[in-house]
Structures are given as C-alpha cells and as structure tokens.
C-alpha cells in the first residue's frame, strides 16, 4: 500500500511538473510574440526629408493613389513634411516589406521553439 501511495505521488508530481512547464512555455510564447510585435512596430519607422514616418498599409495605399507628385504629410512628431510621392512610396514599400519579412522569420523561430 505504501509503495502504491508513493507511486501515485510520484506520478502526480511528474504530471504537475509537466503542466507547470507547459504553462510556462505558453506564457513565454505569448510574451515573446508580444515583444516581437512591439519591436517590429518600432522597425516600421522610416526617416525621410528630416521627418520620421511609421509605414503602414494605409500610408502606402494613400501614396499609391494620390494624384500629385508632391505631397505634404504629418510625421510622427506632428511636423508637416514635404514628400516626393513616388520616391517616398518606393522607400515605404521596400521598408515595409523588409520589416514584414523579418517579423515573419522571427515569428516562425518563436513558433518552432514553442513546439520543441
């Protein structure tokens, strides 16, 4: 009877330890995912003509559809900045794609580490 009791306690302790490890791993995954997203949000900023802009799909769409070659936009510091639309559009597209590619690669690494 004593051996059975010790055996049950050992199994329960092992299961609890495994459960704690799984919870920690899930928490680490969510934390790492959030930190990565915050990093990428910072990486989405691009300097242009003494201004700093956050590149978003909305900004890219705006630049792609605006009819004039010169446009004035408010930067992240709330300053009006003159932009050469096509030049800035190309810069934004390249910068956005680089940031999204980096995010995708790093996110896959986090997912892979979670499954190990």
Region roles according to the model:
Residues 2-116:
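A preference for well-ordered globular domain cores
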